[in-house]
């Protein structure tokens, strides 16, 4: 059941949040150029989570996930072992199958924990956001992120756990961590 849910939510993210609907039918990590034509420079997952723009998470994100779930009924995800294809240019990172799969998995996590994300948004202040974002400079300084958050937040304990998991289990595993291609 857990595997089905993982595939289902990967399909959900495939269809909507990332705008990569053609990936749903891809049989390998060799994605054709047309898949990426017209793709926004930053996906929602990148904009709000990877860059820690927590206070800008849209209020209707739950509604967006509900719509994505409906769309996912017509999409079968193809989970493949994507090899690394590190792209030095930020614009070309979507040609790296491992990065695309990372974003899909991160989107699954975010969609599966929306209540915690919204709780985090409710206690995040502009000052806290600025403090944690100061720890991102071509790479994540994981200890700085955790320290800045722990020193400057008024968030409930469950939100603290969510932020720590997001940083330790997701941001720390960004395939573009430290490559210089992980920021606009």
From Swiss-Prot:
UniProt keyword Membrane present: no
Glycosylation sites: 74
One GO cellular component, as annotated: extracellular region
Localization in the cell: Secreted
PTM characteristics: N-glycosylated.
Keywords attached to this entry: Disulfide bond, Glycoprotein, Secreted, Signal
Leader sequence segment: 1-26
Tissue expression from the record: Highly expressed in atrium. Moderately expressed in the pericardium, pulmonary vein, nephridium, arteria anterior, ovotestis and connective tissue. Low expression found in intestine, lung plexus, diaphragm, subesophageal ganglion, ventricle and digestive gland. Very low expression found in columellar retractor, pedal nerves and cerebral ganglion. Not expressed in hemocytes.
Entry annotated with the keyword Nuclease: no
Cysteines paired by S-S bonds: 29-34, 65-111, 75-82, 123-155, 135-144
Protein name: Cysteine-rich atrial secretory protein
